[in-house]
């Protein structure tokens, strides 16, 4: 009868060691794949949020000061900036279609801002016209021709301006008055004047900073001569001469990623290293303000 044999103790220990080594390699490969997947997801999340906010703010800043037709100097006002938290806009506010606050902690008594961040207000008319029969009584609208402008509630009798032929009613457009800011939970939000009420809309999460830099024309050639992060608040001439707005957005991912050991320098600010497990990216872009009167 053939004698049965088995593994020796040494052979068993070697096989166990090889098995552990192979298992460790497979685990390491799996963990690296998971980490790489999370990193790709986090990077895509940040890029998508930056792209969305970039497209939105570029469009809004570009349209700032668009009120339909070009109007004459009788719209001009040297009055200081009025309370921009109000839900009762006035024609004299239209002379500052771009207005901002620097390094704020609160806004409109009830909004807590991300400490040190900026606030941007955009005033403009819709690019679409509204028929007199479709006006909403509580909504603010603008009507303008080449000589005058009306800002009033949506009652057809309020809008009497005519085209150059003296017969055709001048176009009526919905009035937009929007505040852009980051709250103390790192959420980028927009406060919109809709139907006579200020409505807050969440836009994106994970904004670690929002800074603005303004290109100001000092010699009336419509070209920025100085770049300032803090134009004089309530000073009409400073804001009337803003020709460009540069936006800086520091955006972080929702998902965990590799530790962030970078330092970010922008608009006179320095942030980092933050040393947390978030993917971050600094987005910046400049937009011309082409509709100042």
Cite the ranges covered by each PLM segment:
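Aliphatic-rich helix starts adjacent to a transmembrane/signal segment
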Residues: 2-64
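Alpha-helical hydrophobic packing sites
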Residues: 17, 223, 290-293
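Short capping/connector residues at structural and topological boundaries
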Residues: 39, 51, 72-74, 288, ...
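N-terminal pilin/flagellin-like segments and related low-complexity appendage regions
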Residues: 53-240, 248, 256-279
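C-terminal helical cap and adjacent loop that interface with cofactors, partners, or active-site loops
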Residues: 245
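Short, loop-centered acidic/histidine patches that primarily coordinate divalent metals
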Residues: 248-254, 290-292
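Low-complexity, S/T/G/P-rich flexible repeat/linker segments used as non-globular hinges
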Residues: 274-293
